[in-house]
């Protein structure tokens, strides 16, 4: 949000920094709900909200369903944090017309993220997808709220014209998709300590990521058997994850995903060069795009 504001020529840096808390709270709200959907127990090397309250439920309310208690509390807390994010934006003190426009845009971002979540869940349960469907899901689920949405909100609060808003999208969408591809790679090949969550959780949940669908396209019979035995298996062993990784490498799915993410980053950076924005914002957006695919495995 901060650099979207600067990109559009905004000058009140202190105010936009305070206001940027709003998008962080919206981010947390979405992640809390995402953890419930994905049944994740760990994030940022800490218990997820649903996991934390499930443990409380087991300890205090032995006659009741602890998982339901944990998930219910997480939904409530997520909703409350989302409302706080909206309130901070509403009370930000920018031009009223810009605040109204930004709040409207924020609801658009949340709506598309929810659509992306539903696409992710549907594809997971269906057990198959093509590349176009997966990339469209990545755009809705991730690119909208991680990159495009914050840039738009900041630019809108600075009074940016619609032309600049649209130009920022040309940068944000490919970079946001590349971010999700790298996230998928880290989810299988990354360090659990650095990742802050369980490596292999996407495999256990049966996520139909770009890596999975490309591996399916090129796998032989034995490799297909390994993929099918691991995906959706809640009792994965380290040896199972190692075998899964081996298939992803041998089918060149990893190489394909890395190549596509690099291509998307180049696309986003090239778009950034096509329109005039403030130098500080341009330098940051250029650097953060590179960082998206350099996050450590």
Task: Describe each model-derived feature in a short phrase.
Residues 1-297:
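All-alpha prenyltransferase/terpene-synthase fold signal
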């Amino acid at each position: 949000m901060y650099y979207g504001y600067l990109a559009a020529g905004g000058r009140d840096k202190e105010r936009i920094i305070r206001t940027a808390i709003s998008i962080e709270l919206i981010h947390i709200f979405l992640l809390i709900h995402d953890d419930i959907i994905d049944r994740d127990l760990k994030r940022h090397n800490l218990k997820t909200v649903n996991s934390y309250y499930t443990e409380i439920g087991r300890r205090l309310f032995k006659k009741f369903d602890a998982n339901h208690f944990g998930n219910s509390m997480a939904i409530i807390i997520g909703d409350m944090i989302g409302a706080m994010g909206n309130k901070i934006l509403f009370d930000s003190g920018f031009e009223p017309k810009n605040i109204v426009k930004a709040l409207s845009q924020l609801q658009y971002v949340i709506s598309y993220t929810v659509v992306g979540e539903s696409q992710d869940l549907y594809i997971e349960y269906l057990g198959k997808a093509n590349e176009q469907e997966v990339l469209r899901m990545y755009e809705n689920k991730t690119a909208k709220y991680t990159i495009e949405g914050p840039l738009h909100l900041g630019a809108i609060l600075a009074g940016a014209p619609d032309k600049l808003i649209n130009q920022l999208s040309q940068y944000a969408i490919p970079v946001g998709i590349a971010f999700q591809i790298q996230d998928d790679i880290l989810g299988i090949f990354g360090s659990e300590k650095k990742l802050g969550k369980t490596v292999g959780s996407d495999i256990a949940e049966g996520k139909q990521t770009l890596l999975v669908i490309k591996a399916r396209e090129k796998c032989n019979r034995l490799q297909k058997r390994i993929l099918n035995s691991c995906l959706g298996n809640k009792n994965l062993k380290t040896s199972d994850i190692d075998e899964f990784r081996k298939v992803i490498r041998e089918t060149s799915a990893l190489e394909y995903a890395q190549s596509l993410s690099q291509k998307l980053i180049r696309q986003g950076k090239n778009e950034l060069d096509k329109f005039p924005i403030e130098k500080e914002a341009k330098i940051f957006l250029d650097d953060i795009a590179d960082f998206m695919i350099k996050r450590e495995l």
